[in-house]
Amino acid sequence: MRGREEVRGRRGRVWSALGLREGDCLSVMGSGGKTTLLRHLAEDTENDVILTTTTHMAPPGHPQDPPFLAFQNLERFRLDWAGMPPPRRLLTGRFQPGGGKLAGLLPEEVDGLADLPGLALLAVEVDGSRALPAKAHASHEPVFFSRSTVGVSVLGMQALGRRVMEGEVHRPALMIQRFGWSSGHRLELEDLERIAGAYLALLPPGRRILVLSQARSVPEDLLRDLARRFRDRVERVLGQSEDGLEVLG
């Protein structure tokens, strides 16, 4: 990638809110808005961007998805990339036979993408949450890659008021074990603080950002209250809605 400097091409509110620099590699983890964030990033710039995953993500076809380029191997991808005119904004991954998800790349393959000429941003989903707003992480995740420069933890605010049970949160049994809650426990703001703190503890070294997604599902005073609790723990706290990102702290 090019040197670590502010991105020079057109960029909008999402890139500015995240404070992105030329050549950043984002590890995006958590629940309730990771793929939405990646789509916002691709829509918000005229720079070259690649979106992918090290685990699984929704297959291409959403109206906000950038063009899809199937990943076969790094050499083939480099050739395809070199033959495309800028701006190159792509979603990549492997189709999983018989599955409804897009299969991810190996961490070393993601690292190889970081060296593509002209690439301004590499944004990578590194875990899954089955479209639920809160989760507990299993021992095999997140699946990070070594070139990551920014760790982004996403927490869905629709988790507020949900119960710790199947269909409400991802891996409720692990959540009960780790936080000492009972089955069916109703999540309050203090519980979301603990969940977000657990997410942040998993991030690799580097700049750290917390995104409170589904921001319009809760009163603004509660959203800002939760954001204030993390101001000394991360570089910035953002609220995410369908319209984009807002800096909360």
Name every feature range the model reports, one short phrase each.
Residues 138-160:
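Inter-motif core of Ras-like GTPase G domains
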Residues 91-136:
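Phosphate-binding/switch loop-helix module in NTP-utilizing enzymes
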Residues 28, 49-54, 91-93, 122-126, ...:
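General beta-strand structural signal in soluble alpha/beta enzymes
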Residues 126, 156-157, 178-187, 195, ...:
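G-domain G4 guanine-recognition motif of GTPases
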Residues 4, 200-249:
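C-terminal lobe/tail of nucleotide-utilizing enzymes
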Residues 11-46:
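Walker A (P-loop) phosphate-binding motif
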Residues 42-95:
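N-terminal phosphate/diphosphate-binding loop that engages ATP/GTP or pyrophosphate donors
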Residues 1-15:
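N-terminal pre-Walker A segment at the start of P-loop NTPase domains
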